[in-house]
A protein has these predicted regions:
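Fungal secretory targeting signals
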Residues: 1-17
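Glycine- and aromatic-rich loop/turn segments at beta-sheet edges
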Residues: 20, 64-66, 503, 535-571, ...
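Surface-exposed beta-strand/loop patches in extracellular or lumenal glycoproteins
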Residues: 25-51, 253-266
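Solvent-exposed beta-strand/loop surfaces of large extracellular or lumenal domains
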Residues: 56-79, 434-446
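Intrinsically disordered, low-complexity Pro/Gly/Ser/Thr-rich segments with frequent PxxP/GP/PP motifs
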Residues: 78-100, 451
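Beta-strand/loop-rich accessory regions of lumenal/periplasmic or secreted enzymes
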Residues: 123-476, 480-495, 553-558, 577, ...
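Substrate-binding groove/exosite segments of carbohydrate-active enzymes
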Residues: 364-390, 399-402, 407-411, 415-465, ...
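Terminal, non-catalytic domain-edge segments
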Residues: 479-489, 710, 714-935
Length: 935
């Protein structure tokens, strides 16, 4: 019956024609370049039916639209939209949804424009051809070449786009003398498994290529390192956006990545050597501007017009106009065939060039941080530019231009530079004799690391990079390439206004914009403190160089006051891996303010956490790893790290980023991983017998089930392949959890992963009332997930959801209640609990949901308390101290009173408390409904 209600509720209210307009604005002002953009828009429940709604954009802009999420009644919850390239982007766009209502709710068909200016796609048995109007790209469905040709202006300007991989079986530093023996070296090329293209393309086409790397020489090595490469092509655009993902599936002790990249050939036949151009991005928009055969600076001057043309990348005047002392001696002027930029640290890059293989390299003055883009081409034959977003932040990276003096040059972007040391993913210590659970738990008491042999594996972790490829029929101006470098590193982002997102309730009802619902001086202080924390972490990322192939996007857990250094080398105090939800703080701050700094922090965390901190192959698929010195080092593999609640905002606000969508759907696999990985194997009481069974998994509602529930919720929202099963499991979980005598205070219980049903735990088989309350259960997005879940079910399902919500509200109330209240309700108190400041939002949630003004003082007492060790006090310095001289390796700003745990919870609770109960001295709750507490 519930399914029927969920399907039909609200449809009658949609029977009349609907129209609604939403403004979307640029995150950081009007972009200098727009090669196409995809963005997301939320919609209130019941407002627009999926198969009866059309979308238009202001200014006559062509718009492609699709649904990314649905409310249970079939109305649109989130939509994705694409706009093609334009030379004059507007400062904002108004997206209008309109259409007659009806009483069916099939999927929204992707709307394609009838305009001939849109993307044209051809799909045959062996290839896919996409024409944007400026670029035509051909993608192969088999072999090792992903992109067989790229045309611009009717010219073939690029071909043979493929992936390259180098690896070796050992690392030279194992030998103190630096004379390694017994190391084997391997070279691999991409091997395509399948290539697909999106449907109904008008303003954007997406080509997805999946495959693996296979040896391309005489050596013997298993195929490995599976990849997914997505190519986004927009109408009227010269740019192709590329999302490149690999999954590490090697042996850490013998599979060392020595180079990982993407390579394109550039046809140069017929172009004079002096009309062939090399451009490599330097610092702050700067460029190395050279030609394969330079004619500036020679002893004899060819003429100002000739020199100017070469330097600016235009075709030089006819040679008959040159000084003949130059033209008759061009054979003595070297041609430089190879260029190489190596960014081996976040602070410096080197460049060099040579005439050909076998000749010495000549150094070119380098600098600090390259923009990560290179161009090879000619003034008449055209060429390609290829760039990597966050190039220097993801060091060691590189750019190679090869064979530029031949008929076919090549352009290689190294995601991991072969000039660097091999990528070493072996454990950072040998186990230190921790061969029993007792020893491992004892070691936890000193380094905070939860070690266990076999669990500290990188097998199954991934990495995603974002690249841009640009095609030209002639060499572009240096100014344009500089603009493209900026676009590569900071692509434009369109977002709806915060107040509109809030009003739709499409991503939670627990946040509000600053100053709402009521403002005050104390509220402004909290706002100022949260802004300080955002800027502090932005600064720490830079000062502490939290960059690198694996590391970019993460922050560190705890500070070492004595060393004036974050604890990068101490067990569980190192890389944070989303511990206690800094992601929710950064995304929450962005949602309510539109702040670009918060967006960048959150975006980078979403990319990093979803790929590096989580598993995509093997027994741990769907789970993530607890904080540690290496992102995969800790033996705690849990859904609390991989939970999609950390990536949900990015998925929807981006218009349904496909890689993030994969990660979210993958988290459903955690249900299978729970059978293979017992999260409490080391700490379970000896008298508890537990044998993991898909029908009886012993799970914690906060650290285990909440992540799985969020994955099921998004699958239901998206109407994915498994959505009905996901919905049914959520319904069953919501119906059965309140039947546990102590509700959420039970903490851990049996979960049937086949049906979603809960039953009493093995410690309380008769359901007399178990009490297991942990400070960790509530700090990995469980409140946010439950709120979104209840919102999604909606008022029509209240009979089903209310007992579940009441059980959760009881838990939320009693967590911060006095021990006497706890004992009076449950027979005994909960003991000494931590993270009271972070849990103040649970009290606020109860106060808000039950309209209980008497709880508001408790909210702010918990939040603005005495600054216990796990919180940030109002009287904290709220400023940094400069450390310089011999006290630190380099000058840094420190705040010894800040830990990432405390900062994350201060931010999340601050955002939610202000929204749920109003400012500390101006409460928005006027009721006094103590009776509603049911205590």
């Amino acid at each position: 019956m519930l399914k029927t209600v969920l399907g039909l509720y609200g449809l009658l209210s949609c029977a009349a024609a609907q129209s609604n307009s939403v403004k979307v604005k640029w995150l950081e002002g009007i972009p200098d370049y727009l090669g196409g953009v995809t963005f997301g828009v939320p919609w209130p429940r019941g407002q627009h039916l999926a198969n009866a709604t059309t979308f238009t954009a202001s200014g006559g802009v062509e718009l492609q639209s699709w649904a990314t999420a649905y409310w249970p009644d079939g109305s649109l919850k989130w939509t994705g939209h694409a706009i093609g390239a334009t030379d004059s982007p507007a400062d904002e766009y108004t997206i209008t949804a309109s259409g007659p209502g009806n009483t069916t709710f099939s999927r929204l068909r992707r709307q394609s424009s009838n305009s001939t200016r849109g993307v044209q796609v051809g799909n045959s048995e062996d290839k896919i051809v996409v024409n944007t109007g400026k670029v035509t790209a051909t993608f192969r469905k088999s072999g090792n070449v992903l992109v067989s040709s790229i045309e611009s202006g009717g010219k073939l300007v690029g071909n043979n786009g493929r992936l390259v991989l180098r690896s070796q079986s050992g690392t030279p530093d194992d030998d103190e003398d630096g004379k390694p023996t017994g190391i084997n070296y391997f070279s691999f090329a991409s091997k395509i498994h399948n290539t697909t293209v999106s449907d109904n393309n008008s303003q954007r086409a997406l080509v997805t290529v999946q495959g693996i790397h296979a040896v391309d020489d005489e050596t013997s090595h298993e195929e490995w390192l599976p990849f997914t490469v997505r190519f986004y092509l927009y109408a009227n655009s010269e740019a192709i956006r590329i999302i490149h993902t690999i999954i590490y599936d090697g042996e850490a002790k013998s599979d060392f990545i020595a180079g990982l990249g993407i390579r394109f050939d550039v046809p140069l036949a017929g172009e004079e050597q002096y009309n062939r151009h090399v451009r490599i991005a330097g610092v702050d928009g700067g460029l190395l501007r050279e030609s394969v055969q330079g004619i500036t600076g020679l002893r004899r001057d060819p003429g100002a017009a000739v020199r100017s043309a070469q330097f600016n990348g235009t075709e030089t005047p006819d040679k008959t106009t040159w000084d003949q002392r130059v033209t008759t001696r061009l054979q003595w002027v070297p041609t430089w065939s190879d260029y190489r930029l190596s960014q081996l640290s976040p602070d410096g890059f080197n460049i060099k060039k040579r005439t050909k293989a076998g000749q010495s390299w000549v150094k070119i003055p380098g600098s600090t941080r390259s923009g990560g883009l290179a161009y090879l081409g000619g003034s008449t034959v055209g060429g390609l530019a290829l760039g990597l977003r966050d190039f220097w932040k993801k060091y060691p990276t590189g750019l190679d231009i090869s064979n530029a003096a031949t008929d076919t040059g090549s352009l290689t972007l190294w995601l991991y530079s072969p000039q660097a040391e091999p990528l070493d993913v072996r454990p950072y210590h040998d186990g230190l004799g921790q061969d029993t659970y007792a020893k491992q738990l004892d070691a936890l008491e000193i380094t905070y690391e939860d070690y266990e042999d076999g669990y500290n594996t990188p097998y199954g972790v991934g990495r995603t990079n974002e690249l841009f490829l640009y095609a030209f029929s002639s060499t572009p101006s240096a100014g344009h390439l500089s603009t493209l470098t900026n676009n590569t590193n900071d692509p434009p982002v369109l977002i709806p206004e915060p107040t509109y997102i809030r009003d739709t309730k499409a991503i939670g009802s627990y946040w509000d914009v600053p100053g709402s619902p009521k403002d005050s001086e104390k509220a402004q202080t909290i706002e100022s403190n949260m802004k300080f924390l955002i800027e502090f972490y932005e600064g720490q990322v830079e000062q502490r160089r939290w960059y690198g192939f694996w590391d970019h996007g993460d922050i560190i857990h705890t500070y070492d006051d004595d060393r004036h250094q974050w604890r990068y080398d101490i067990g569980g105090y190192s890389w944070d891996n989303s511990e206690l939800s800094p992601d929710l703080f950064f995304w929450g701050h962005f949602l309510r303010t539109g702040d670009a700094k918060a967006y960048r922090l959150a975006h980078d965390q979403a990319r990093h956490g979803g790929d590096v901190d989580s598993y995509h192959l093997g027994n741990f698929t769907g789970l993530g790893t607890r904080h540690g010195v290496q992102h995969w080092a800790d033996s705690a593999k849990q859904a609390r790290i991989s939970t999609p609640v950390y990536r949900k905002t990015f998925f929807y606000i981006s218009g349904g980023d496909e890689r993030t969508g994969d990660l979210i759907r993958e988290t459903q696999e955690a249900a299978k991983a729970f059978v293979l990985v017992d999260a409490r194997r080391k700490v379970r009481a000896a008298n508890v017998v537990y044998n993991p069974d898909p029908k009886a998994l012993y799970l914690n509602f906060g650290t285990d089930w909440a992540g799985l529930a969020q994955a099921y919720l998004i699958e239901w929202e998206r109407r994915g392949p498994n959505w009905e099963d996901a919905r049914d499991k959520l319904v069953e979980a919501i119906k059965t959890y309140p039947k546990l005598k102590n509700g959420f205070v039970t903490g851990e219980a049996y979960y049937d992963s086949l049906t979603g049903a809960w039953s009493p735990p093995p410690t309380d088989p008769d359901n007399t009332g178990n009490i297991t309350v942990s400070h960790l259960s509530g700090v990995f997005g469980v409140l946010e997930t439950i709120d979104q879940l209840i919102d999604h079910f909606g008022p029509e399902a209240r009979n089903t959801t209310q007992p579940f919500l009441d059980a959760f509200l009881d838990y939320a109330y009693y967590y911060g209640a006095s021990k006497a209240e706890q004992a009076a309700r449950y027979g005994k108190d909960f003991g000494n609990l931590n993270l009271k400041q972070g849990h103040s939002r649970f009290t606020a949630y109860v106060a808000h949901k039950r309209n209980n003004a008497t709880l508001v003082p408790r909210v702010w007492s918990e939040y603005l308390g005495d600054g216990s060790k796990d919180g940030l006090a109002p009287n904290a310095p709220w400023k940094t101290v400069r450390i310089s001289g011999s006290a630190a390796l380099a000058p840094v700003d420190e705040a010894t009173w800040v830990s990432t745990n405390a900062a994350a919870l201060y931010g999340v609770a601050g955002i939610e408390n202000l929204a749920l109960v109003g400012a500390p001295d101006a409460s928005s709750i006027t009721g006094n409904s103590t009776a509603k507490l049911r205590v």
